[in-house]
Amino acid sequence: MTTLIKNAQVWQAGQLQTTDILIAEGRIKAIGHQLHDQFGPADHVICADQHFVSPGFVDVHVHLRDPGQTAKETIATGTLAAAHGGFTTVGAMPNVDPVPDTPERVATMVARNQQEAHVHVAQYASITTGRTSEQLVDFAGIKAAGAFAVSNDGSGVQTAGTMFAAMQGAAKVGLPLAAHVEDDSLYHHGVMNAGPVADRLGLPGINNVSEAAQVARDVMLAEASGVHYHVCHVSTAESLRVIRNAKAAGINVTCEVSPHHLLLCDEDITMDNPMLKMNPPLRSAKDRAALVAGLLDGTIDMIATDHAPHTDAEKQGSMKTAAFGITGIETAFATLYTALVKTRLLTLGRLIELMSTRPAELFGLNTAGRLVVGAPADLTIIDLDHQYEIEAATMLSKGHNSPFIGWPVYGNVLMTLVDGKLAYGKETQA
């Protein structure tokens, strides 16, 4: 079957250009004009009406909550929400129950993802059994079973010896190691950023050093082990300084930033509001400015949402007792496009690179994040001019725990194709 996308706007040579895209057998067959003259009529035609067509977004940091926490999310609902947000590939974090910490459990998750997901799912395995700081997983076995990377996300590996051995094991088999960086001895059970805002609200704070100290430890271990070390959801200026220096020294370090850390800071927390509780927390305005600067100068390699759905009950009451985490996969593009591209801090092409091309390249997801002939037809069609208000009622995730509800934004995802097939669009809304 062939599909022709007509009158698409694509980002080429630093600007938007109009073209057609021909899809055959799930892959991009041709990009250009008057393709029907060369290839004949297509079986199906999608009129893009001059809307923007992007390579599908790639999010390497998503919590699908399945198995074990399906009241929050499932593979099906989380990946449909991903398609709604324009994502065609997501990395499923391993903080589920049971933890994918053996080859058998990883293989089970890979099979379930293939059967139940609406988009491509790259499966993480944990670094250690049970996501503790003790026994390492069988790195060769979990890679053979289909893991694309390892992470203990949600928990920092607390002992340097365990982390170094893990890095050596991951490096030996060529698996990236993605780290939730948090030193428990410096954490002190805080619920938001330590500082004047936390003091005013009477809430326990989380110091910047609890993150930055573990980043500093880990980059030295990464240099010694040769692993691809990836810092999850970087949030502090100090962490960025360490990462910037590590890159300058030639250490194989990459990092991601989440949309909420680019768009919000602790000064936006004017009351005890669980919808603004996440880990790492919203930091100071100075930290937020440093993250934006890191995005602009290339220190930050990619954007990842840390999509963390919860039930309504888990996000009620006080920040002292509510669960950490917010959703983000359905709001990421629109909020970032509105705040960064419409204000000319970033070009559209650079945002697409950060949300699609670079995460795919750096994590070895070589078939994702590209709008080129021969690549899988993982594409997102977006109305860049449509302004709308983010509403909980339109979200397809089970979790509606978003601080962006009510925000006016531009950039409405109209349709998402995965391997040339409709994953989200009008037909899925019937």
From Swiss-Prot:
Source species, domain of life: Bacteria
EC number: 3.5.2.3
Top class in the EC scheme: hydrolase
Positions of Zn(2+) 1 binding: 61, 63, 153, 306
Binding site for Zn(2+) 2: 153, 180, 233
Binding annotation for substrate: 63-65, 95, 279, 310, 324-325
Zinc among keywords: yes
Transmembrane segments: none
Classification via InterPro entries: Amidohydro-rel, DHOase, DHOase/Allantoinase_Hydrolase, Dihydroorotase_CS, Metal-dep_hydrolase_composite, Metal_Hydrolase
GO cellular component: cytoplasm
Cofactor, how bound (note): Binds 2 Zn(2+) ions per subunit.
GO MF annotation list: allantoinase activity; dihydroorotase activity; zinc ion binding
Reported function: Catalyzes the reversible cyclization of carbamoyl aspartate to dihydroorotate.
Name the record gives this protein: Dihydroorotase
Organism: Lactiplantibacillus plantarum (strain ATCC BAA-793 / NCIMB 8826 / WCFS1)
The encoding gene: pyrC
